[in-house]
C-alpha cells in the first residue's frame, strides 16, 4: 500500500503509537513456516520504490511490514493510501500511526494519477486512513482521486478500500457516484472482537454500508475482508459470511492476522492452510462470486488478477441464469 507524504519534519522522533504505550507487552508467537517470505531485493521492487518516492509518496507497505511487499512491488502492483499517514482511530491490530492528521494534500489526486500512469497499472487499489476530523470523512478526496486517475489513465480499473464514513451523511453516496469498479470495505474481524480490536467502528454499520453500495449501484462489485487468528470461533466466521451475503457482497478475503508490535493485539492462533481452504470452500457454497482465503491473503494482494476473475464469475452466473 502507499500513502501520501508525511509533513511531520521530525518523523524519526515521532512516537508512532502513543495511544498504545500504556499497554503491557504481549507475547509474540513464532511464525510457522507457511508465513515466512523472502526479503524484497528484486529490480522490479527497486523500480517501484523509486517511482513512489519520486512522486513524494510514502509506503504503508513498508510501515505495516506487509509480507507481500516483495512480490507485489516486483510486479509493479501498488495500493495508494490517501489523505495522509496519520489515522484518527486506534485499532488494536493496525500499524498505521494514530494522532491528529495534517491538512489534506490538494496535489495528491494528481500525484497519485501520475504514479498510476508511470507504473502502467491496469488495476489500482486506493485506500485511506480514517479521517473522522473531516466533515465528509474524506469522500470528496476519494472522488477527486478517482476522477484524476480516470483522466490520466482511462484504461486503468479502480478499486477502493474505504473507511466506514461513520456519522458522515452523504459521504458514501458521493464515493459510489464516482463509479469505482470495485468497492471494498473490510469488516476486519467478527463482531465479538470489535470492542477490543476495532473499537472505533460498528460491525452492523459496516454491513449496512456494503448493503447500501448495492442499493445505490447494483452493478458495482463489492468486497470485504477479515483477519483470522484474533481469537474468533469458526462458527462466528461462518455467521459473518452469512451477514455479508445478506448484504449481497461479491468477494470475500480471509488472511492471517500478524502482530505489528508487542503493544498490538496478540496473535491468538496461526490458522493452518487447510483451515483457510475449508473457509474458502464454505464461502463459495454460501454464494460469493470470489473468495481468496490463505495465510498471506491481503485485501489488495493479486487485486488485478482477482478483478478479472470476478468479472468472469459474474458473467458465468448471468449466463447460467439466462439458460
From Swiss-Prot:
Statement: the UniProt record of this protein carries the keyword Nucleus: no
Cofactor note: Binds 2 [4Fe-4S] clusters per subunit. One cluster is coordinated with 3 cysteines and an exchangeable S-adenosyl-L-methionine.
Cofactors required: [4Fe-4S] cluster
Species this protein is from: Sinorhizobium medicae (strain WSM419) (Ensifer medicae)
SUPFAM superfamilies registered for this protein in UniProt: Radical SAM enzymes
NCBIfam families (alphabetical): lipA (TIGR00510), PRK05481.1 (NF004019), PRK12928.1 (NF009544)
Residues where [4Fe-4S] cluster 2 binds: 87, 91, 94
UniProt cross-references to HAMAP family, sorted A to Z: Lipoyl_synth
Family that this chain belongs to: Belongs to the radical SAM superfamily. Lipoyl synthase family.
Pfam families xrefs: LIAS_N (PF16881), Radical_SAM (PF04055)
Name of the featured protein: Lipoyl synthase
Entry EC no(s): 2.8.1.8
Organism superkingdom: Bacteria
Keyword tags: 4Fe-4S, Cytoplasm, Iron, Iron-sulfur, Metal-binding, S-adenosyl-L-methionine, Transferase
Primary location group: cytoplasm
Any one Gene Ontology molecular-function term assigned to this protein's record: metal ion binding
Native organism taxonomy: Bacteria, Pseudomonadati, Pseudomonadota, Alphaproteobacteria, Hyphomicrobiales
Presence of keyword Iron-sulfur: yes
Compartment list: Cytoplasm
Residues binding [4Fe-4S] cluster 1, per UniProt: 61, 66, 72, 300
Enzyme class: transferase
Domain Radical SAM core: 73-289
Designated gene of the protein: lipA
InterPro entries in UniProt: Aldolase_TIM, Elp3/MiaA/NifB-like_rSAM, LIAS_N, Lipoyl_synth, rSAM
Amino acid at each position: 500500500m502507499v500513502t501520501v507524504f508525511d509533513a511531520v519534519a521530525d518523523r524519526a522522533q515521532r512516537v508512532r503509537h502513543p495511544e498504545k504505550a500504556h499497554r503491557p507487552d504481549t507475547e509474540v508467537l513464532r511464525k510457522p513456516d507457511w508465513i515466512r517470505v523472502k526479503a524484497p531485493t528484486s529490480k522490479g521492487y527497486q523500480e517501484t520504490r523509486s517511482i513512489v518516492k519520486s512522486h513524494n509518496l510514502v509506503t504503508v507497505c513498508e510501515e505495516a511490514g506487509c509480507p507481500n511487499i516483495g512480490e507485489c512491488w516486483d510486479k509493479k502492483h501498488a495500493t495508494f493510501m490517501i489523505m495522509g499517514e496519520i489515522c484518527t482511530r486506534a485499532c488494536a491490530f493496525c500499524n498505521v500511526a494514530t494522532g491528529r492528521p495534517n491538512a489534506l494534500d490538494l496535489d495528491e489526486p494528481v500525484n497519485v494519477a501520475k504514479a498510476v500512469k508511470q507504473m502502467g497499472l491496469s488495476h489500482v487499489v486506493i485506500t485511506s486512513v480514517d479521517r473522522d476530523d473531516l466533515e465528509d470523512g474524506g469522500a470528496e478526496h476519494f472522488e477527486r482521486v478517482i476522477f484524476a486517475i480516470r483522466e490520466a489513465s482511462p484504461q486503468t480499473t479502480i478499486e477502493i478500500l474505504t473507511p466506514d464514513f461513520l456519522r458522515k451523511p452523504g459521504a458514501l453516496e458521493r464515493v459510489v457516484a464516482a463509479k469505482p469498479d470495485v468497492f471494498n470495505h473490510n469488516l476486519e474481524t467478527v463482531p465479538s472482537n470489535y470492542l477490543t480490536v476495532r473499537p472505533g467502528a460498528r460491525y452492523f454499520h459496516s454491513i449496512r454500508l456494503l448493503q447500501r453500495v448495492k442499493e445505490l449501484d447494483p452493478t458495482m462489485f463489492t468486497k470485504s475482508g477479515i483477519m483470522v487468528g484474533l481469537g474468533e470461533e469458526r462458527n462466528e466466521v461462518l455467521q459473518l459470511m452469512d451477514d455479508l451475503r445478506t448484504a449481497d457482497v461479491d468477494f470475500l478475503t480471509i488472511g492471517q492476522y500478524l502482530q505489528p508490535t508487542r503493544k498490538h493485539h496478540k496473535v491468538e492462533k496461526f490458522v493452518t492452510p487447510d483451515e483457510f481452504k475449508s473457509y474458502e470452500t464454505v464461502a463459495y457454497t454460501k454464494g460469493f462470486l470470489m473468495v481468496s482465503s490463505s495465510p498471506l491473503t491481503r485485501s489488495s494482494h493479486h487485486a488485478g488478477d482477482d478483478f478479472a476473475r470476478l468479472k468472469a464469475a459474474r458473467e458465468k452466473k448471468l449466463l447460467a441464469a439466462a439458460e
